[in-house]
Each structure stands twice: as structure tokens, then as C-alpha cells.
Regions:
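Glycine/GP-enriched mid-protein hinge/lid loop-to-helix segment characteristic of carbohydrate kinases
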Residues: 144-213
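A generic structural signal for well-ordered coil/turn residues at beta-strand boundaries
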Residues: 38, 105-107, 199
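Gly/Thr-rich phosphate-binding beta-strand-loop-beta motif of the actin/hexokinase/Hsp70
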Residues: 36-77, 169-189
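A short local loop/turn or secondary-structure capping micro-motif enriched for an aromatic residue
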Residues: 60-62, 85-88, 162, 199-201
């Protein structure tokens, strides 16, 4: 660890002790001795805290929320699709309150936005009641916002291993809204100016409607 981080062995030892005290890492096994005291091995505690993941989507002309709870090792602890009337701040607050009661270790929320954002601020969304909201301030919990198509592209690339097609254009055609896309270049998400890369809805001279897709 000292070699990889450039820190001194003493500093690494101090950090490990702090993580051990917080239960963020746990002692696993003792390594093989080479004559002195056998080295200790540690593993990360993936249940140190949990993540609540929410993203709205359309299916059969209805609006749903995909709601997942995950640990830090990307293991799903819970998942459901819930039909709702509309997407707004109060709905999201209710979901967070409900799931924090069920999963007290939830410390962060991931939100898939059908639109654009600048950090925690949603600048555009297919669900207009979310526009102009700073979710971290409104919800009093750290929120990671990512464009829904960007998230899907990252997941698709990860599932495929990323080596076969390191540069990909991912295009999504939802049922009730114009399409969106995402760009992966050398396995890295390209967001462009003000995170607007992939916003093909606003391409001039193309009238997006269901008759052409």
C-alpha cells in the first residue's frame, strides 16, 4: 500500500488503524510468516454503509421508479419497480424516508436523471418539477446525480468488459420522450460542455416522433 500510494509505511499503518476502528475494514486472515510475526490481511467492509439508487422511467405509458439498495460491493440488497403518478421532490423524499427506516445504513443516494445536471443541481429533466432543484440540499443527504442514459451506457460497457468496443455510442429510445445518447471514448464517459454530450433531442432539423422510430 505504501508503494502504491507513495505514503510512508507509518502513515499507512495509522490510516489502517483508523479504518479498523471505524469498522470500514475488517481483519481477514493472517498471511504466511517469513520468519517474523505473520502479516495481517484486511478486507474492505462492503456493508460499512449502503446506497439507495432511484431512477424514473416510462413503461406502457406509465411512470415508474426503479428503486435499489446496494452495498459498496455492488451487491443488491433490495430492488423493485414502483408505479407512481408523477416524479417530484416530495415523492423522492418519501422514498428516502421509507428506505432509510428499512435500511438504516443508507448514507448516499444515486439518482438517474432524464436530463442534464451541474453537480447537485438539475438543470433540465423530462420530469419538469425537478428542474432547478439542488437535491443534496433539498434532501439533506449526499446525492450523486447522473444522466440516466450515461448510467446505462456505463453499465452496458462494464457488463461487456469494455475491451471489445472501448469507444461506443449508446442510444436510448424511451416510450414517451425523445431519445437520448451517451458517448464512451476509451472506456471513459464523455460529458462534453455543461454535461450536454449525448443530448441529441436538440439536434436541429430532426423532428423526433414515434413515426420515425
Amino acid at each position: 500500500l505504501a508503494k502504491e500510494t507513495g505514503l510512508t509505511s507509518a502513515t499507512v499503518g495509522t490510516i489502517l488503524n483508523e479504518l479498523l476502528e471505524k469498522n470500514e475494514i475488517v481483519e481477514a486472515n493472517h498471511g504466511k510468516s517469513t520468519g517474523g510475526r505473520p502479516p495481517k490481511e484486511y478486507s474492505y467492509n462492503f456493508d460499512f454503509f449502503h446506497c439507495l439508487i432511484i431512477f424514473p422511467f416510462e413503461k406502457n405509458n406509465n411512470t415508474y421508479l426503479n428503486i435499489c439498495v446496494s452495498n459498496l460491493g455492488e451487491t443488491y440488497l433490495y430492488s423493485e419497480e414502483r408505479k407512481i403518478e408523477k416524479v417530484n421532490l416530495q415523492i423522492i423524499k418519501n422514498i428516502i424516508k421509507e428506505f432509510k427506516e428499512k435500511f438504516p445504513k443508507i448514507e448516499v443516494v444515486g439518482f438517474g436523471n432524464a436530463g442534464t445536471n451541474q453537480g447537485d443541481l438539475i438543470t433540465f429533466s423530462d420530469y419538469s418539477e425537478l428542474e432547478g432543484l439542488n437535491l443534496s440540499k433539498e434532501l439533506s443527504i449526499p446525492v450523486v446525480i447522473e444522466n440516466d442514459v450515461n448510467s446505462a451506457a456505463i453499465g452496458f460497457n462494464k457488463r461487456k468488459g469494455g475491451s471489445e468496443n472501448p469507444s461506443t455510442v449508446y442510444i436510448f429510445f424511451p416510450e414517451s420522450y425523445p431519445p437520448g445518447s451517451a458517448l464512451l471514448i476509451d472506456n471513459k464517459l464523455y460529458k462534453g460542455f455543461r454535461n450536454c454530450a449525448g443530448e441529441i433531442t436538440n439536434i436541429k432539423h430532426i423532428l423526433w416522433n414515434k413515426n420515425i422510430y
